[in-house]
Curated annotation (Swiss-Prot):
Main location: cytoplasm
Domain free text: The DPH-type metal-binding (MB) domain can bind either zinc or iron ions.
Domain DPH-type MB: start-end pairs: 106-168
Family as reported in the entry's similarity comment: Belongs to the DPH4 family.
Residues that hold Zn(2+) according to the record: C128, C130, C156, C159
Localization per record: Cytoplasm; Nucleus
Protein name per UniProt: Diphthamide biosynthesis protein 4
Keywords: Cytoplasm, Iron, Metal-binding, Nucleus, Zinc
Length: 188
């Protein structure tokens, strides 16, 4: 791995780019990045082969075939890569504080109760400072997917800003907060 990509201390926290030992910037410069990704995939398989791993430096980080294959699949698909890059930007520490801090550049924290609900479209929404009145928009199904975490990260439809929506799932029979895998606008 190059020194710029060895920022990960373990195979569990490595990005797909680190697994394949390539950079996003390199892929962005390619008209068709598929051959480059495939070459990186084959190199990663050879570098992390079990026969070679057993004889190498124990302090080195090695990746599994599953990690390498997942990296190939995500980075080879343009739509999956765009979604992955967006998720990386949100999860990386930025600005004055990291993931555990209260401030991240381009990410605003709000409570679900502070958002408007459109009955006709059955979605929550909020305007963005870029001017779009419905720039942050999501539905009940989006909340259900992340009900265990209690937060949903939504990107603006028109710019690069993000909204982290915090919520709690309430039991229908009680007003107490209950861990649940179902969410409804009436329960929230």
């Amino acid at each position: 791995m190059t020194s710029s990509q060895s920022i990960s201390s373990s195979a569990d926290t490595a990005t797909h780019y680190q697994v394949l030992n390539i950079t996003s910037a390199l892929l962005d410069t390619q008209h068709d990045s598929t051959p480059l990704i495939k070459r990186a995939y084959h190199r990663a398989l050879l570098r992390n082969h079990p026969d070679k791993v057993a004889n190498s430096d124990p302090s080195s980080v090695f990746f599994t075939v599953d990690q390498i294959t997942t990296a190939l699949n995500v980075l080879s698909s343009p739509s999956a890569r765009v979604a992955y890059d967006a998720a990386l930007r949100v999860s990386r520490p930025t600005g004055a504080a990291g993931r555990d801090g209260s401030f991240q550049t381009g990410v605003e924290n709000v409570d679900l109760d502070d958002l408007a609900f459109d009955e006709d479209q059955e979605c929550w929404y909020r305007p963005c400072r870029c001017g779009n009145e419905h720039s942050y928009e999501f539905r009940e199904a989006d909340l259900e997917e992340v009900s265990e975490e209690g937060e949903l990260v939504v990107g603006c439809l028109d710019c690069s800003l993000w909204l982290r929506v915090h919520f709690a799932v309430l039991d229908e029979n009680e007003d107490d907060v209950q861990p649940s895998s179902t969410t409804s606008k009436d329960k929230i």
